Amino acid sequence: MLINHLIVVLLISLVGTGGAEDDGLCSADQKSCAQSEPDQINEDEFSFKIRRQIEKANADYKPCSSDPQDSDCSCHANVLKRDLAPYKSTGVTRQMIESSARYGTKYKIYGHRLYRDANCMFPARCEGIEHFLLPLVATLPDMDLIINTRDYPQLNAAWGNAAGGPVFSFSKTKEYRDIMYPAWTFWAGGPATKLHPRGIGRWDQMREKLEKRAAAIPWSQKRSLGFFRGSRTSDERDSLILLSRRNPELVEAQYTKNQGWKSPKDTLDAPAADEVSFEDHCKYKYLFNFRGVAASFRLKHLFLCKSLVFHVGDEWQEFFYDQLKPWVHYVPLKSYPSQQEYEHILSFFKKNDALAQEIAQRGYDFIWEHLRMKDIKCYWRKLLKRYVKLLQYEVKPEDQLIYIGPKKDEL
């Protein structure tokens, strides 16, 4: 009798829990299923936590250079040291270069002249790279380089020495041992858009445009909205787009077309929005950055608006990311934030406007002072001078490579 009573009680208890529906799941035969309420947070606790993170980050922060002009680009020195470290014990042999050739375009500096493979997968990207290499060849010793112009890095660190290498790539995660170099887009070959049909480039010119635009729209005149405009290269961006549709007074975020666009499904079941210039991003206080296929070329531009940058995910890196510090220069968000997480963090900064402006100003200052064209040139120079010391063989000419420069009248 006792056993039967226990069974009945257990059955009543199971039925009373509501099963799958109360767990936030909908069964196949249900006509409708109420969405579960978003997680509630204690606003005071959340605010206290964010303030503590900001205070600690700024207390721990040390400027990357004691020289205000940072004339030797020392701010980025740790990155190239770390990237070259795997080859310090082995050096770089001719066999390593030959086995890595399939991962990129072969460049050769020989006799103070620059040569490369006849076939460049992305000519505009090679143009952007060569813009920085050509002025350096007169001062550099002979060397061979494998430069990857694809979006994605090539050498998985899990492969160890079997991965081959070295290979130079513009972006990577910790799972790769590629050597980062300043992307071609600092000069040419960036993503082609309606506003930039020949591709995003000329960082020198864009810096000046954005500096003027930021000065013309002071913080007090910016719209207190989160803003994003870009294509759907990753579904990580979806929750911000959906939040914008649900709460347009908080966020203005829409998808644009990219080269693979076929229908509104590619823009999350909505018409594709028009592109917005980087200069017009400066109208908004809160700007969002996401990775694309790899690191986003957008990030460096956003800082120059003197707007608060929200950087989603920290996996993908470019050479200059290392000295951009979370809560000092930007607001870090984990990958795939929920709509509620966006709401909470935006609400905090709307209520703490002075804090938002301080972080925005520090982000602007860092990019303006430490990502100048002379910093790009300096990084290339230091990177190649350190790299060539690793070579363990005599570099020889190769007839199959084509001559790039310098031009005859420059010799």
UniProtKB/Swiss-Prot annotation:
Keywords: Disulfide bond, Endoplasmic reticulum, Glycosyltransferase, Notch signaling pathway, Signal, Transferase
Principal subcellular localization: endoplasmic reticulum
Top enzyme category: transferase
Effect of residue 267 to I: Nearly complete loss of enzyme activity
Spans annotated as Interaction with the consensus sequence C-X-S-X-[PA]-C in peptide substrates: 192-197
Variant or mutagenesis effect after changing residue 124 to F: Slightly decreased enzyme activity
Pfam families: Glyco_transf_90
Pathway noted in the entry: Protein modification; protein glycosylation
Keyword Phosphoprotein: no
GO molecular function, one term: EGF-domain serine glucosyltransferase activity
GO BP terms: cell fate commitment; muscle tissue development; negative regulation of Notch signaling pathway; Notch signaling pathway; positive regulation of Notch signaling pathway; protein O-linked glycosylation; protein O-linked glycosylation via serine; rhabdomere development
EC number: 2.4.1.-
Active site: 151
Positions contributing to UDP-alpha-D-glucose binding: 229-233, 237, 276-278, 294-298
Signal peptide annotation: 1-20
Effect of a null allele: Flies exhibit a temperature-dependent loss of Notch signaling, resulting in bristle loss. Defects in muscle development.
Family matches, as InterPro entries: CAP10, O-Glucosyltr/Glycosyltrsf_90
Disulfide bonds: 64-75, 73-378, 120-126, 282-305
Family statement drawn from the similarity comment of this UniProt entry: Belongs to the glycosyltransferase 90 family.
Role: Protein O-glucosyltransferase. Catalyzes the reaction that attaches glucose through an O-glycosidic linkage to a conserved serine residue found in the consensus sequence C-X-S-X-[PA]-C in epidermal growth factor-like repeats. Regulates Notch signaling by glucosylating Notch in the ER, glucosylation is required for the correct folding and cleavage of Notch.
Protein name: O-glucosyltransferase rumi
The organism of origin for this protein: Drosophila melanogaster
Lineage, top ranks: Eukaryota, Metazoa, Ecdysozoa, Arthropoda, Hexapoda
